Amino acid sequence: MTKKTLAFASGSDHKTKEMQMLLSPFGYEIVTPKILGIPFSPEETESTFVGNSFIKSKELFRLTGFPSFADDSGISVDALGGEPGVLSARFGGPGLSDKDRALYLLNKLGTNHNRKAHYSCVVSFVDANHQVSFEGKVEGLIASDYDELGKFGFGYDPIFYYPEFGKRFSEVPEGEKNKVSHRKKAMELFLEWFQTIQ
């Protein structure tokens, strides 16, 4: 089977690896701006995951001509009015590490008994004939502390407890997490649609 190329608008090696794992069984190969040697840093100015995802996919399609997709994802905490949401990667200010951002969130949430949270991912796709988006979510709880021992995941995974696993995402190997992840759910919807236009 000949591999088909899709351009993925991300500079995150973690996300690219996760997307490639999800796409390879379907015969798709991912290229990124980094792989193509293209400078790529569009400003994410929208207030929704959908809006920010489209900023990236439209710009990558404009630059490369490849069918392009992007994701915008983050974590939303009920007791914080949906924060950090679209600001997940910048929560707490510039220059913070993933761990610092997670600790900042824990501190902001404090002892609030409402620990409900969800990860959201919106995947948008743009080519000459289409502009579509798909959303996936995974519901969980914010733990009371930061998992220093977990070997897996990234971002807010060390504080995101997934009741169905009885574990935090940082304690779950990528293959297992990918079965339920917000990104996988959005990608499944995308792939289901994408195969109908082939």
Curated annotation (Swiss-Prot):
Quaternary structure annotation from Swiss-Prot or TrEMBL: Homodimer.
Official protein name in the record: dITP/XTP pyrophosphatase
Broad EC category: hydrolase
Example of a GO cellular component annotation carried by this entry: cytosol
Cofactor(s) this protein cannot do without: Mg(2+)
Cleaved signal peptide residues: none
Similarity field: Belongs to the HAM1 NTPase family.
Residue numbers binding substrate: 10-15, 73, 154-157, 177, 182-183
Organism expressing this protein natively: Leptospira biflexa serovar Patoc (strain Patoc 1 / Ames)
Binding site for Mg(2+): 43, 72
UniProt keyword annotations, A-Z: Hydrolase, Magnesium, Metal-binding, Nucleotide metabolism, Nucleotide-binding
Active site positions, chain numbering: 72 (proton acceptor)
Source species, domain of life: Bacteria
Cofactor binding note from Swiss-Prot or TrEMBL: Binds 1 Mg(2+) ion per subunit.
Molecular function terms, GO-annotated: dITP diphosphatase activity; ITP diphosphatase activity; metal ion binding; nucleotide binding; ribonucleoside triphosphate phosphatase activity; XTP diphosphatase activity
EC number: 3.6.1.66
Pfam families: Ham1p_like
